[in-house]
Amino acid sequence: MAQKTLLIITDGIGHKPSSPHNAFTQAKKPTYDSLFASAPHALLSTHGLSVGLPEGQMGNSEVGHMCIGAGRILYQDLVKISLALKDGSLEKNPTLLGFSSRAKRIHLAGLASDGGVHSHMEHLLGLAQIFSRLGHEVLLHLITDGRDVSPTSSKEFIAQALALESDLIKIATISGRYYAMDRDKRWDRIKRAFGVIARGDSPTSLTPQEYIQAQYQAGITDEFIEPAALGGYQGFEPSDGFVFANFRSDRAREIVSALGGASFEGFDRGAYQPPKTLAMTSYDDSFPFPILFPKEKVEPTLAQVISEAGLSQLHVAETEKYAHVTFFFNGGIETPWENESRVLIPSPSVATYDLKPEMSAPEVAEATLSGMRQGYDFIVVNFANGDMVGHTGNTEAAISAVESVDRELGRLLEEAKKSGYAVILTSDHGNCEEMRDERGSMLTNHTVGEVWCFILAQGVTEIREGGLNQVAPTVLKIMGLPTPKEMDSPLF
């Protein structure tokens, strides 16, 4: 067999029955239609235990790309942290106890949601209880979600935090993730969340629930809740400690570096002394903070096997998904392997991606076409549209997003045939195939379900249903490379 291989990941395009709110089935997509008619295809599971998440938990881009790149199921931080809370080992964690001994008040920040993509409410509340049992006053800095869960669900999670309120546990600030969890160096957003958390800017006399209700009445949903300080909160004190409870790294880096970093260049923090800081996981290799759940080494990965075989590879994506085809795809390793090239295409600078549903797909495709013409042995490319436009809740824009991806797929498949590439086309998780629920309410979160996988390769006439963990072994089989014992079985 031994073919050069192109792996295409169409982010956020999954499988659900046809409906008016399924952007995938509603789109005009001649390339996909042709693949359904003539290419071997099967469904792959992208959620729950099949990708190392709790049963029934929706998949996400980080987990999906890690699973694809590792070629096996990796139990995710979400599962590990939940187990540590359940069995009591987190309370005895030496890093946590050491941090506790050095700090007075504890500022505990995180995404207040059970979406399980960046955080989980049970982790945030579990840590609050642990620190209060250790005698600390705990000040909660709640980041409202509205993206991985319903856009008006924050009251439910705030109620859970309020149920814990005591002499030691209080809600200090609220901020929408649009401000507190940017990942694209939009420092004006981070600065607003920083000001509220670090200094108690934008005070309100409203209770947490009253404040959320006032924001809703102003037409502002959870993702975009304006940062506010509550209950007379006035900011950090020199003896305080700051804990960030999100486990996913990409949207934690900016806010944690702003609040905890000794040196910081995103904006002028004025006369600022950062507090002692504790991170849930490893957000960035350059961060000096202690970590509750350090990164486990994931090897071998697909990229590693290809590199060690002396072959060349190219990883392509636009900004929104660049970390996914590099850092996450390579098992949490930032540095490229030998003979691994990378192309980053800037994502369009728009407030929300429904304003430009094609995003940077044409440029991503151009870079991939160039890679095939240069003869890279393996290319992985991500199209972000289905996910990023799906998150806006705009069905018409999501349909346009699918059509944009379909156009670029047509160009890539034509060049792949010309240049002798095998093609594996799949997704990391679903999103745009379910834009509204059965009641007609907008859905902005990922779906719980399967995605399609198509394979165009010499001698492949049929593939099995399976999981994302089987993609890497399938690539290696097509490329004529041995599959490491740590990886799972291929799809044919």
Swiss-Prot record:
Catalyzes the interconversion of 2-phosphoglycerate and 3-phosphoglycerate. GO terms for biological process: glucose catabolic process; glycolytic process. GO terms for molecular function: manganese ion binding; phosphoglycerate mutase activity. Substrate binds at H118, R147, D148, R177, R183, R248, S249, D250, R251, K321. The lineage of its organism: Bacteria, Pseudomonadati, Campylobacterota, Epsilonproteobacteria, Campylobacterales. Pathway: Carbohydrate degradation; glycolysis; pyruvate from D-glyceraldehyde 3-phosphate: step 3/5. This is 2,3-bisphosphoglycerate-independent phosphoglycerate mutase. It catalyses: (2R)-2-phosphoglycerate = (2R)-3-phosphoglycerate. The active site is at S61. The gene is gpmI.
